[in-house]
Amino acid sequence: MLFFEWDPRKAARNLRDHGIDFGAARAALVDPFRIEEIDQVVDGELRLRTTGMAEGQVVVLVAHANREAENGIDEIARIIHARKASPGERSEYERIRASGGWNPADR
């Protein structure tokens, strides 16, 4: 099972600056048509960026880091940043969604 966590101060700042609530952004991380890419490594932590739908209408890009939960079964996604997708990111997402899904070999 996938669980989510975030810094509440960062979430409040993100909502103010980008108009995207981290709670709503969770939907992008479980969107079956999401595009997930490696973003960067910070202090040994692999960070990903995912473009997907949130609340059925807004395509968002979410920066996050995933880790295994203490029980060794579940996964925790720590949301770091969320924003509306750029026109190019939105176009790529819509193209992939129309084709039935993302294949990493397409990159």
Where are the model-predicted features located?
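Ribonuclease/tRNase effector modules and their secretory precursors
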Residues: 1-107
